[in-house]
Amino acid sequence: MIEFKDVTKTFDAKQGAVHAVQDVNLKIEDGHIYGIVGYSGAGKSTLVRMLNGLETPTSGSVVIDDVNITTLSGAKLRAQRQKIGMIFQHFNLLWSRTVLENIMFPLEIAGLSKVDARKKAEHLADLVGLAGRETAYPSELSGGQKQRVGIARALANDPQILLSDEATSALDPQTTDEVLDLLLSINQKLHLTIVLITHEMHVIRKIADHVAVMEAGKIVEQGPVLEVFKRPQQAVTKRFVNEEVTPSLNDTTVVVDQLLAKYPKGTIVQLTFHGDQAQLPIVSEMLKKYPLDLNIIEGGIHQTQEGAIGSLYLQLTGDQEQIKGALAYLQTMRVETEVLNRE
């Protein structure tokens, strides 16, 4: 288990003390994929640097499997770091080395014989989908293939934890999904704890099971991914969720004003579906019971590791009693309903 206990990190600057991380308390269970999401400057990277001992907390402690790594130094800290692999946005490959030689590099540093290092590197190349590309140089690889080399290299010393710091930020959407699928597969095969640092809720939604949202150095919200998607509490969380679920309405501070200006008539309703609800014809059944004119403004269904989450914006026009009946029906079907206006 990973635990952050009352962790604060302060940097001295000309303008005074800068609190990069403030009073963070967080638990990450073994074998989970835990996402930490926030915009630039939220404190995500500082937090992860404290996890592998590259930064020391100003106060508080970071504990991994009952070992307080903030008290370690020298050989003990180096031994602890060997239990943690890390992948980055920029691949940090050795351009004069082949794929296999890049994967072998940390094994050579660890003292493995060349024969054993090569054998293990070949296995890792196959694990990350690079069989047949072992003799290629980084300049001959696509961005996704380079990141696969980075992942294989991070796994070389059999870490218990894999840190991913914006590892898909430089990749196109299709390659991002392929790399995320690989990380999910590795998590399942190796029972590896993965900590994802990202500013993209898509990354969290696709493979994480738990998420913490950071803003201004603080964790403002945390919980199972599906629960956070279903009921975001903080403004920054709502913005992240809307960016993923309803991308064309991604600024929660202006969503309602935009909708009311564009659709001045009728009743504008936001529906949120969870799990099996997202697969059922609930809206069409509603229209059979309550004959209304319906305009679908925006919508989408996305999968998380714990189930589907769907969001739908509707414009309903017609008899007010019929509209009230329709909204009551949706609530009986356990669809979360928010009326943004009334005609």
UniProtKB/Swiss-Prot annotation:
Q: PROSITE patterns, alphabetically? A: ABC_TRANSPORTER_1, ABC_TRANSPORTER_2, METN
Query: Where does this chain mainly localize?
Result: membrane
* Binding positions for ATP per the UniProt entry: G38, Y39, S40, G41, A42, G43, K44, S45
Q: Does the keyword Cell membrane apply?
A: yes
GO CC terms in record:
plasma membrane
List residues of the ABC transporter domain: 2-241
Ordered alphabetically, the record's keywords are: Amino-acid transport, ATP-binding, Cell membrane, Membrane, Nucleotide-binding, Translocase, Transport
GO terms (molecular function) for this protein are: ABC-type D-methionine transporter activity; ATP binding; ATP hydrolysis activity
Report the subcellular localization: Cell membrane
| Catalysed reactions listed for this entry | L-methionine(out) + ATP + H2O = L-methionine(in) + ADP + phosphate + H(+); D-methionine(out) + ATP + H2O = D-methionine(in) + ADP + phosphate + H(+)
What EC number(s) has UniProt assigned to this enzyme?
7.4.2.11
Pfam families membership: ABC_tran, NIL
Membrane-topology annotation of the record: Peripheral membrane protein
Briefly state the protein's biological role: Part of the ABC transporter complex MetNIQ involved in methionine import. Responsible for energy coupling to the transport system.
Q: How does it assemble?
A: The complex is composed of two ATP-binding proteins (MetN), two transmembrane proteins (MetI) and a solute-binding protein (MetQ).
Annotated family: Belongs to the ABC transporter superfamily. Methionine importer (TC 3.A.1.24) family.
- Protein name as catalogued: Methionine import ATP-binding protein MetN 2
